[in-house]
Amino acid sequence: LLYVSGMAVSDTPAEVFKRALAHAARALAEQPDLEVAFASDGPKLSGHQLTLPTPPRDPSGPEAQALRGQADRMALRLANHDEGLNARLRPADASAAEVFDAVEQTRIEAVGSASLTGVRDNMNAALVSRLHRMGAAAATEAQRVPVAEAVGLLVRERLTGEPAPDGLKAMVDLVREDLEDRAGDQLDALTALASDQGAFGAALKDVLRALDLDPGDGRGEDASDDPGEEEPDPQEPD
């Protein structure tokens, strides 16, 4: 495990690349004291430490851009995400939580990289690399497409105005019509809320409901904010 700090380190291409990654991560996270480490179990966030995978031998190749994207997306999470609020909003149901997590990460990245083309390119490379490793990018049947990833890509299109990255369009198109038919209106409603994590997360529960997933708020699929005529009056506190 190698920590990158203010100490002098060798100027090999790998070390220069690590220092550049650490500097960029601190800037995006808006945390100048963020600890950045490199280890085989990265990427992960733990408290005030960001652990990234060990860089490839060639710091100029596609693997290096994907690693920059991993660093960027996690740094933006530190700057644009409230973990406490997320814990209160996140569904307990595993399938619903997967979709919730994917869409919240999409929000984080869209908000954080709105004017940063290079950061968006890096995160696109990381996304394509991850879905290729999962085997999802090569899917030829709708049932092989991870719902969470597909919903995240549909939200990404709405928040950024950009199509799915090259290599992922065919995957998302396999399920696009079905997901749009079921939850298109609810997905559209997310667009205006991207800068407000709480409002976005609350609206995201409507997306989950439209997809027949349990949002964890005790409301049924057809629930509305209007209590209706048969709703009992609230009891006075003791």
Model region roles, listed by residue range:
Residues 2-193, 200:
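Basic/hydrophobic alpha-helical interface regions
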Residues 218-238:
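Acidic, serine/threonine-rich intrinsically disordered low-complexity regions
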